[in-house]
Structure formats: C-alpha cells, structure tokens
C-alpha cells in the first residue's frame, strides 16, 4: 500500500513540476480578433479628456481602434489604471491601408507595467508593403508624450 501511495505522490509531484517548468502557451490569435477586446471601451471614454484603461481587453480596444482608423487621440491622455498582462494573445499589428494612423496624444503608464506583450507584424497580404510596415505598441507616434 505504501508503494502505491508513493507512486501516486511521485506522479502528482512530477506533473506539477512539469507544468511549472514547461508552461502552456495561451497565445492564440490576436488581441484585435473580435471578442478579445472591449468594444464598448471607446464609447465609454470617447468624450473624456483622460481615457482610463483598467483591463487588457480595454488596452486592446485602444490599440485596435488606434491602428484601424485615422483618429489619433489628439488632445487625449490615455492612462493605465492597472498592470497589464498581455500574454493571452499576440499583438498583431494590423496593416492600415491608409498608412496614416499614428498616436499623437499622451500615454501615461502611471507607474504600471505592460508585460507579456508579443508584437508581431501583420502577415503579407493585400495592402502589405514591407517598406512601410510598422510594428509595435503604437506603430507610429507623432507629437506624442509617453510617460511611465
């Protein structure tokens, strides 16, 4: 009986260690895929001078709208209200067909950190021009202020 209990304990222990040593990657899809970002965030914050981001889904909504439109958050402060763990999905920088989007507001991290962010440029396809592809948290910034 002791031998069975010992084997059971050993199997459980090795299983726990395997999960800790070899974590399972949950990075499937993009933060910009429908359902991965908070579609209501912009509507709730559009008229505010300071736009507060409290969740990774809200952060993704900020990024999705910034990279998919020509609106560049002028005269707006975008402030983090919490640390952002962005490891659930990849930050796939979409190809903006106009190549005119950029961030021009104030991004205030307010002492919070963004972790687990995997930035991936968009795949080749319609509208892709390797000479003009930008990839990053903002893609392009112009007359912007970035604070920690």
Task: Give the positions of each predicted feature.
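Bacterial N-terminal signal peptides that target proteins for export
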Residues: 1-9
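Surface-exposed repetitive/solenoidal architectures
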Residues: 26-148
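C-terminal segment of classical bacterial N-terminal signal peptides
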Residues: 15-25
């Amino acid at each position: 009986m002791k031998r069975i209990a010992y084997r059971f304990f050993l199997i459980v222990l090795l299983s726990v260690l395997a999960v800790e040593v070899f974590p399972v990657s949950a990075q499937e899809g993009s933060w910009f895929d429908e359902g991965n970002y908070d579609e209501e965030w912009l509507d709730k914050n559009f008229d505010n001078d300071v736009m507060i981001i409290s969740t990774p889904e809200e952060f993704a909504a900020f990024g999705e709208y910034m990279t998919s439109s020509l609106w560049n958050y002028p005269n707006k402060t975008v402030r983090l209200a919490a640390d952002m763990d962005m490891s659930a999905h990849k930050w796939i920088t979409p190809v903006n067909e106009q190549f005119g989007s950029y961030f021009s507001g104030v991004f205030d991290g307010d002492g919070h950190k963004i972790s687990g962010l995997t930035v991936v440029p968009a795949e080749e396809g319609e509208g892709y021009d390797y000479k003009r592809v930008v990839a990053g948290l903002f893609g392009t910034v112009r007359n912007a202020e970035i604070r920690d």
